[in-house]
């Protein structure tokens, strides 16, 4: 399976550097970013598009899907952003990710969700091309899982808006083909929130 991982386009929460809720829609720049990643991926023969149910990811996935009318469009809760608890609507610099309160989803929980969604896609589309459209925290967990890193690994894995990472999974072997590539945004710009 060829797995393409991308993050949603820019939102107001990204611009303001706050941790936003499920209804944070794409900005006009976020829509441009989604259009750019869509055009970049239009020659891929995508079999399935898995999306988070959150508006920002779903809209990005819908824009990608316009070039892939035969791809199965699947909303999956395992691709939701991490549960933010008391960190919801806080500024990024107000948050201590090393000492998470109990109401904030930890890296191990995200890693378990990552494992579930990767294995689900792999079982349904073992020879297919699949794209995940999701969020920063869960995408980082998916990449940690595919790299066989410890769930609590704190190494910074950047996830720019609509950045693309590609992994080839075959016969139990995983090859990373591309990581956090945003060349499709050269004329638009990107941020790393």
Language model regions located:
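Short active-site segment of divalent metal-dependent hydrolases/proteases
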Residues: 11, 138-139
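Loop-to-helix element that buttresses phosphate recognition and phosphoryl-transfer chemistry
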Residues: 3-59, 103-115
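Phosphate-coordination/substrate-recognition cap region in phosphate-metabolizing enzymes
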Residues: 35-101
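Acidic, His/Gly-rich catalytic cores of divalent-metal-dependent hydrolytic chemistry
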Residues: 177-193
């Amino acid at each position: 399976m060829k797995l393409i991982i991308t993050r949603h386009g820019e939102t107001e929460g990204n611009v303001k550097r706050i941790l936003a809720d499920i209804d944070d829609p794409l900005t006009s720049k976020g829509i441009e970013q989604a259009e750019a990643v869509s055009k970049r991926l239009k020659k891929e023969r995508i079999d399935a598009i898995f999306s988070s149910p959150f508006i920002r990811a779903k809209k990005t996935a819908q824009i990608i899907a316009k070039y892939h009318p035969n791809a199965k469009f699947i909303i999956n809760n395992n691709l939701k952003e991490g549960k933010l608890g008391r960190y919801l609507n806080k500024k990024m610099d107000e948050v201590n990710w090393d000492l998470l309160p109990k109401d904030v989803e930890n890296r191990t929980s995200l890693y378990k969700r990552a494992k579930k969604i990767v294995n689900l896609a792999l079982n349904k589309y073992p020879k297919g091309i699949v794209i995940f459209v999701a969020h920063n925290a869960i995408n980082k967990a998916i990449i940690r899982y595919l790299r066989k890193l410890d769930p609590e690994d704190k190494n910074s894995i950047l996830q720019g808006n609509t950045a693309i990472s590609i992994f080839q999974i075959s016969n139990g072997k995983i090859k990373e083909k591309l990581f956090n590539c945003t060349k499709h945004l050269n004329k638009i710009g990107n941020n790393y929130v």
